[in-house]
Each structure stands twice: as structure tokens, then as C-alpha cells.
Regions:
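Conserved small/polar residues in nucleotide/adenosyl-binding loops
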Residues: 226-230
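Short, flexible loop segments at boundaries between secondary-structure elements
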Residues: 72-83, 216-225
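A structural-propensity feature for long, helix-poor, extended segments
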Residues: 77-97
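A general structural motif
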Residues: 65-70, 77, 98-114, 208
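Short glycine-rich anion-binding loops that position phosphate/pyrophosphate groups of nucleotides
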Residues: 48-51, 57, 128, 192-195
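A glycine- and small-aliphatic-rich helix-loop capping segment at beta-alpha/alpha-beta transitions
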Residues: 50-69, 141-142, 203-212
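Active-site-proximal beta-alpha loop/turn segments in soluble metabolic enzymes
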Residues: 85-92, 123-131
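Contiguous, glycine/small-aliphatic-enriched amphipathic segments in soluble metabolic enzymes
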Residues: 1-47, 103, 108-121, 127, ...
Length: 230
């Protein structure tokens, strides 16, 4: 039954029943098909499978919510200073402006789901257009789009993380930002290397900090793509 449903779903992507039937012997395909058909409420995977393959299967079987072209992952950090939401920590290696826009929109929705009001900084090594080449340009374009289309959302960038985290320093040097007077609680990183390294560094240096995640954002149905801490 699962093979038939998958082959019909992906018939226009070249899938055949025989290929779909072979895939049902793989735990990721079988487990995600259980969720897709309603035979299971959620699927947890990743401990014994390659993460990149797990992402591929999730997009193929469960799919991305129609209002987005990309999905992402968030980690939540609870510390004495407060609660912080970090994205995208596991999925998109080299996001362009379009991907960063989706990550920002997904983060906004997820932060509100956890009953927090997002105050979002789009991070980079550059501040507010100081560098006109490379990854800061993508972040700058994403911020521009978000500010135009979400006028009530507290979001700004691109900015260095020290300015994001220090309200007084940010307000003194960049008083024009939409974040003036606000404490940032949502950090969107420019790429996977920076986001993944940041949350793992914080976790390693502060044993009193609670780490929650990964939290998948943007898939059609619940699927936890777990990564081994080792």
C-alpha cells in the first residue's frame, strides 16, 4: 500500500511502483510513509542514518508546506539571560536570499507558536550594508523583503552578533534600526556553518544552559530529524 501511494504521488517525478516498493525496505521511507498516510502521528529518525539522506526522504515523502520553498531547523536555548531561538541550525548549507526569507518566516511562526514575540536579527559579519559582496548581500536582501512585507515584525540586519545581543551598544551606534529599544530573542544565521557552530559552542561552554531541538520548521507533518551529539 505504501509503495503504491508513494509511486502515485511522485509519478510526475519519474517514480515507478517497483522503485517505491524497494524503498519501503528502508526505515526512513517506511516510517515517513506511516506519518504521511496517518498510520503514525510523528516520525523520529537520524540516529543511525545519514542526515543528508534523511532530509532528502523527508522532502520526497512528507513534503514542504505549500507556502514555502524550503524548510529549516531551529534550536532553542534557555539560559539565565533568557530564551533564544536560533535558525537554521541543520538544513540549508548555503542559503541565498530566497532561502533566508523562508527561514525568517518559518522562525517568526515558530517563535510565536512557543508564545514568544519574535525580535529577530539577521546575522552576518557585516553591519547594515557595510560589505556589498558575498553572503552579507543575501542577508541584506532578505531583510529588505521581510521589512517591506512584514511591517509589524521587529526584524533588522544584516548585523554582527555582538550588536544583536547588546541592545545599548546597537541603539547607540545604529539608532535607525527597527529593533531600537528591543532585546533580540531570535537569531537567523547566514549559513549552516555559522549556525551549527554557534549553538554547539554555546552548549559546550555553558553546562547550565538548556538546549531544545532540533525543531523542524516547514514540513507538512511532524518529523524529528535527530542528530547524534557525538
Amino acid at each position: 500500500r505504501y509503495a503504491r501511494i508513494l509511486s502515485e504521488k511522485r509519478a510526475r517525478q519519474g517514480a515507478t511502483y517497483e522503485e517505491a516498493n524497494d524503498k519501503m525496505f528502508e526505515r526512513n521511507y517506511f516510517g515517513m510513509m506511516m506519518v504521511e498516510t496517518g498510520d503514525a502521528d510523528a516520525f523520529i529518525t537520524g540516529l543511525y542514518t545519514k542526515y543528508s539522506n534523511t532530509i532528502k526522504v523527508a522532502k520526497e515523502v512528507i513534503g514542504i508546506q505549500p507556502q514555502y520553498k524550503h524548510f529549516g531547523t531551529m534550536h532553542i536555548l534557555n539560559s539565565k539571560k533568557g530564551t533564544y531561538f536560533l535558525a537554521d541550525t541543520l538544513i540549508n548549507r548555503h542559503p541565498n536570499a530566497e532561502t533566508l526569507i523562508d527561514i525568517a518566516k518559518l522562525s517568526e511562526h515558530t517563535v510565536r507558536f512557543f508564545n514568544h514575540t519574535p525580535v529577530m536579527a539577521m546575522l552576518s559579519y557585516s553591519n547594515f550594508g557595510a560589505d556589498t559582496e558575498g553572503s552579507p548581500v543575501s542577508v541584506h536582501e532578505a531583510v529588505e523583503y521581510m521589512q517591506q512585507n512584514y511591517p509589524d515584525l521587529a526584524i533588522d540586519g544584516e548585523m554582527q552578533v555582538n550588536f544583536a545581543m547588546d541592545r545599548k551598544m546597537r541603539d547607540a551606534k545604529y539608532p535607525f534600526t527597527r529593533l531600537k529599544g528591543k532585546d533580540v530573542n531570535t537569531l537567523v544565521f547566514p549559513n549552516l556553518s555559522s549556525a551549527n557552530s554557534a549553538y554547539k559552542l554555546l552548549q559546550a561552554m555553558n553546562t547550565e544552559m538548556e538546549l531544545i531541538g532540533p525543531i523542524q520548521m516547514g514540513l507538512n507533518k511532524p518529523c524529528l530529524l535527530y542528530t547524534s551529539p557525538s
